[in-house]
Amino acid sequence: MKYIDTHTHVNLRAFKDDSVETIQRALDAEVAIINVGTQIDTSRQAVALLDQFQENVYAAIGLHPSHTFAHDFEDGEEIKFKTREEHFDVAMYRELAQHERVVGIGECGLDYYRLPEDRDHEEIKVLQRAAF
């Protein structure tokens, strides 16, 4: 491999119909990938995708701070999602981490950029800090 993309999300809903093909295109272009989970479901999906490839596909598992509280998010352009509140379940993530190609645990730290207008920002910050 010539390159490695250290932060992909081919495990998300936008790629549900072509995740394997998307990963294969990267591999064909000599790009290894680390596919990053943002909550338990997408972390499971990142790990499940590993079994479809022999090498050069890895996973990081974790809980993104924007999933520590329930909300709808839209950036006005292309990103739009609805999320439920989730707490970091150490046992569940520990189990996923047993796969030999899980190379990281954690998403990206605290995220105060995507705070909903209609929620108490301090309350959300407390929820995020508690998860990490």
Language model features: what each stretch is:
Residues 1-132:
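Mid-domain alpha/beta scaffold segments of enzyme catalytic cores
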